[in-house]
Every structure is written in structure tokens, then in C-alpha cells.
């Protein structure tokens, strides 16, 4: 099902909607006990939701072999449309064997609840090492994204989906804004240009600097932190959300920012994921997307500006969303302000470089991030959360 929506065209031209109506849901529920079952892990469940709400438009289901191979090899769907990350439902041979192409498959969450259905059009094998090498640029299992690929089943199930059940987010129900709603909110505020910002870290001073630089040139900011599956050492989503709320309350104009959660899972695919994140924000209605240093990177697998360079391999009209590329920002001790090499007269010795990794290292040591790293209210919240977790662990 597609729908006419306000704002820029979604990727592929139509905002996909695969949420079952009440009548459709009842029809599927009546068949529940007779359908073969596949249990979804956290990432597959978030992918199901993102497909259903249109966040992954133009996808209406999990990728078939032709699309999958085209994306892995060429960063395009089989029809030529740019798409950089495969969206697949991988299962074991034991799960796949009894499933019949052309039939319906019941999709359950981890609690065994019937949350969706898959119209199974294809079952196919895939090369895990080839996917890892092409998508993640490494075959090392130490890479968290590669580890997921290696751990999942060897058979992909493909076909359109329907979402039957979706709970409000247990922690952030008020920030659960789907693409059709975000687009309407942008229109209601009169925003013609909107910049999206992807983050899985608390906003430190370098983030704040580049966000405000971007906000100088557009009508509004869509702050869209990822709350799906991340690495175990990433700062928990509830802590990060409190930090975002603090930043918006004290340091941003309230009428020019919308905060919403991104329910998709982090893949740590670096440059390819930067393209993926931009296309998602396009579907949410953003016209621009911030791409900073080492976007969606992990460890030393990607170059500092590889993600920015990858955007240059596509024609702007193909992507349909403009990347706003920023250099690594730092705190300049000479001017006592945030800057980049484009705006600072300082020497390297006068620059304090900031990163989410450094903030996490300080927190693990029980140290308060300095004001050059984080706003004091944010630093206080981070250290409070860290101490609270330590107290719980000690019980």
C-alpha cells in the first residue's frame, strides 16, 4: 500500500505502508495456528517495523536474491535505485526447509507473539564472506557487523511483509514518530528544508557545533537518534535520550528542532551505512543529512572521511537528499570556542579533539567529561547514570 504524503518524494517515489488494517489483522490471526513460524531477533524485528512504516521505502519486504546481490555488489537495487545495505531475513536450514515458496509465514517476536507475516516468494543461499567483504570492507569477525552476518543462518527468506502488531516504545512512546507523521510535522511548521542528524552517542560539543552550523542554512533540524540494537559498550538509549532532552532544553531553539527515535538497528557499516542513513532520513522527509567524521564507523576499519567520499559516487538526483559534509570539529584553546580547520587560526597543539569514544572512556573511569567535551548538564547526567549502573552492578 502506498500513500500521498507531504514534503519531498520518498526514495523510489512512494512511501510504503505495510501495516495491516484491523480486518486484515483478524484474517491473519484466524490462520495463526496453521502457519509455519519464524522467530525474529532484535534486528530482524526492527527491520520488519522499518519496512512497514516506510522507513525503508521502496522496500515492501525482505530482499530477494536479485536485489540482494545487486545491493551487495553495486549498492543498487536490481532496478538501479541506490541502496547500500542488504535488508534480509536469514534463518537456519532447519527453519527454512519446511517453508514453501508461495505460502505465508508467521513472524513472531522473541516472546512468541505473532507480530507479522511474510509472503514467502523465495528462499536462497548467500555467501557470508562476500557480503562481509563488500558491505563492511572486512571479513574479520571482530567487526560487530560482520559478527552478526557470520552468526546468522545461511538461508535468506524473501518476500513482502505485513506488520500486525507493534507496541509503543517502552521508554520513549512520545518520540515514536513514523515517516508519515514526521513529514506532516515538518509541513505544519512550514519547514521546506530539514536537516537530519543520525547519532548513537550523547551530543558532545563537536556534534553541537556541526548541527548548529547546518541549522543556520535550513528551516529545521530532525534529531533522530538510533535506539535499535547497538554494541554492548555503547551508552544505553535511555541515558542518551535524557542527554538529548537536556541539550534541546538548554542549547537549541525549541521551535526549530524535532526529536524522534530511529527504531532501526545499527550495522556499523561505515560509508555504506552513511548512504543508508541518508535514505532513511529522506523517507522521513529530510532534504539534507549531516555526514561527519567516520560516520557509522567502528574501530579503525574506515577512513575518517570515507563516508563523505562515497556520496560522490552517486549523482545528487539519484539520492534525492543533500549530504552536508563537515570536517572534524575541535575545541580551540586560543579562541576558546568550537571550530574546524576551516575557521580556526590555531596550531595543532591548541586543539582539543572530541569524540564519543573519548567520552565513553572517561565515563568508564568515573571521570566527569570536561566542559570542552560536553555541556555541564549533559556531563552531569552521564556521570549520574554511570554511577547508578555501578551501584546496581554492585548489589
From Swiss-Prot:
This is Sulfate adenylyltransferase. It comes from the Bacteria. Belongs to the sulfate adenylyltransferase family. Its EC number is 2.7.7.4. One of its GO terms (molecular function) is ATP binding. Pfam families: ATP-sulfurylase, PUA_2. PANTHER family: PTHR43509, SULFATE ADENYLYLTRANSFERASE. The keyword Disulfide bond does not apply. HAMAP family: Sulf_adenylyltr (MF_00066). The keyword Nucleotidyltransferase applies. It catalyses: sulfate + ATP + H(+) = adenosine 5'-phosphosulfate + diphosphate. Keywords: ATP-binding, Nucleotide-binding, Nucleotidyltransferase, Transferase. It comes from Synechococcus elongatus (strain ATCC 33912 / PCC 7942 / FACHB-805) (Anacystis nidulans R2). Pathway: Sulfur metabolism; hydrogen sulfide biosynthesis; sulfite from sulfate: step 1/3. SUPFAM superfamilies: Nucleotidylyl transferase, PUA domain-like. It is an enzyme of class 2 (transferase). GO terms for biological process: hydrogen sulfide biosynthetic process; sulfate assimilation.
Amino acid at each position: 500500500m502506498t500513500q500521498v504524503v507531504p514534503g519531498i518524494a520518498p526514495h523510489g517515489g512512494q512511501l510504503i505502508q505495510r501495516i495491516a488494517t484491523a480486518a486484515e489483522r483478524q484474517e491473519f490471526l484466524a490462520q495463526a495456528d496453521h502457519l509455519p513460524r519464524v522467530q525474529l531477533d532484535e534486528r530482524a524485528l526492527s527491520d520488519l517495523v522499518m519496512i512497514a512504516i516506510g522507513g525503508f521505502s521502496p522496500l515492501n519486504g525482505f530482499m530477494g536474491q536479485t536485489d540482494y546481490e545487486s545491493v551487495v555488489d553495486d549498492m543498487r537495487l536490481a532496478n538501479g535505485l541506490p541502496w547500500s545495505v542488504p535488508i534480509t531475513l536469514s534463518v537456519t536450514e532447519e527453519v527454512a526447509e519446511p517453508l514453501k515458496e508461495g505460502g505465508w509465514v508467521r513472524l513472531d517476536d522473541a516472546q512468541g507473539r505473532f507480530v507479522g507475516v511474510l509472503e514467502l516468494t523465495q528462499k536462497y543461499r548467500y555467501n557470508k564472506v562476500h557480503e562481509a567483504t563488500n558491505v563492511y570492507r572486512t571479513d574479520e569477525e571482530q567487526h560487530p557487523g560482520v559478527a552478526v552476518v557470520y552468526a546468522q543462518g545461511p538461508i535468506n527468506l524473501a518476500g513482502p511483509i505485513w506488520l500486525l502488531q507493534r507496541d509503543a516504545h517502552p521508554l520513549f512512546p512520545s518520540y515514536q514518530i513514523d515517516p508519515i507523521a514526521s513529514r506532516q510535522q515538518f509541513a505544519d511548521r512550514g519547514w521546506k528544508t530539514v536537516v537530519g542528524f543520525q547519532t548513537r552517542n550523547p551530543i558532545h560539543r563537536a556534534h553541537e557545533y556541526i548541527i548548529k552550523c547546518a541549522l543556520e542554512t535550513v528551516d529545521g533540524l530532525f534529531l533522530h537518534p538510533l535506539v535499535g540494537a547497538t554494541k554492548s559498550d555503547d551508552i544505553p538509549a535511555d541515558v542518551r535520550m535524557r542527554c538529548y532532552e537536556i541539550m534541546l532544553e538548554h542549547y537549541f531553539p525549541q521551535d526549530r528542532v524535532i526529536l524522534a527515535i530511529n527504531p532501526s538497528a545499527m550495522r556499523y557499516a561505515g560509508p555504506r551505512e552513511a548512504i543508508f542513513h541518508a535514505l532513511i532520513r529522506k523517507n522521513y522527509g529530510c532534504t539534507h543529512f549531516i555526514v561527519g567524521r567516520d560516520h557509522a564507523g567502528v574501530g579503525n576499519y574506515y577512513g575518517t572521511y570515507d563516508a563523505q567520499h562515497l556520496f560522490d559516487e552517486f549523482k545528487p538526483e539519484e539520492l534525492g537528499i543533500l549530504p552536508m559534509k563537515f570536517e572534524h570539529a575541535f575545541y580551540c584553546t586560543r579562541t576558546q570556542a568550537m571550530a574546524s580547520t576551516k575557521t580556526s587560526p590555531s596550531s595543532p597543539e591548541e586543539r582539543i579533539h572530541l569524540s564519543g569514544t573519548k567520552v565513553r572512556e572517561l565515563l568508564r573511569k568515573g571521570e566527569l567529561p570536561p566542559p570542552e567535551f560536553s555541556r555541564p548538564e549533559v556531563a552531569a547526567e552521564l556521570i549520574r547514570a554511570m554511577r547508578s549502573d555501578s551501584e546496581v552492578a554492585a548489589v
